[in-house]
Amino acid sequence: MKVWLFSDLHLEFADLRQPRTIPDADVCVVAGDLCRAPANGVHWLGKNVAHAMPCIYVAGNHEFYKGSIKEGLEDGRAAAAQFPNVHFLENDFVMIDGVRFLGATLWTDYRIEGHPDLAMVYARERMNDHKLIAEQRNPWKRFVPETAFRMHQESRLFLTSVLKADPIKTVVVTHHLPHAKSIPSRFEGDLLNAAFASDLSEVIEVGRPALWLHGHTHDTCDYRVGSTRILCNPRGYGDENIAFDPALVVGV
């Protein structure tokens, strides 16, 4: 199977009315931060890509800016129901041609730099996620690091349990980073890394998915943990990432 991977197009800042190219692939995977609001991302994929291949889409943090997670997920699922070829996943999976795709935003556990309590305080002060995102609209609740931690734990449990249940060929798609090797070297030691990445080494090594595809960082990466290949192919803001390949296709 050939998988077309990209993330972090950030259409809310630099509009692309349609992809510059649609490569020869069997499945399109979008690892978050496509645009503002999950439903808008679903509609963009339904209009521009789904005619060519099935689409796997997970929300990034920016999908929820100036909105809420609860209602955003509900709206994304409702929109995806209109497009049989667009699969919007949050702690959910879909089978395509014998390959299982697991999807979740993932968020973080704030532990990767070794000071989770301090990292949560730092994230609350520094991350726009906790200024521009609500957990829910009615009744209104702010999205706080404690909620991100809880949601991360829920996603980690989902991924672990499904990977253990049946060892079939699997692709995991998350927005947040699953391993420290995905953190760009220029940010080494930065406490804010804990709001971007978590160490899921055990999940990866025990579950052994064929691929783990993610976004969030605006730096390309491609490496292995055990038998699992981990990739990120983000565009970033405008043409921020010069290594971005809009037609990247990987095999599974």
Residue ranges and their predicted role:
Residues 102-171, 178-187:
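Active-site-proximal loop/helix segment associated with metal-binding centers of metalloenzymes
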Residues 22-23, 96, 162-168, 206:
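Glycine-rich phosphate-binding loop signature in dinucleotide/nucleotide-binding domains
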Residues 10-16, 36-40, 62-73, 93-95, ...:
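Active-site environment of divalent metal-dependent phosphoester hydrolases
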Residues 56-122:
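A basic- and aromatic-enriched beta-loop-alpha substructure that forms the phosphate/nucleotide-
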Residues 1-58, 64-73, 135-138, 142-145:
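N-terminal active-site segment of His-dependent metallophosphoesterases
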Residues 5-7, 28-33, 56-61, 87-91, ...:
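Active-site neighborhood of phospho(di)ester-bond hydrolases with catalytic His/Asp-centered motifs
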Residues 81, 184, 190-210, 218-252:
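Binuclear metal-dependent phosphoesterase catalytic core
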Residues 1-4, 93-103, 224-229:
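Beta-strand-turn-beta hairpins that frame and shape the catalytic cleft
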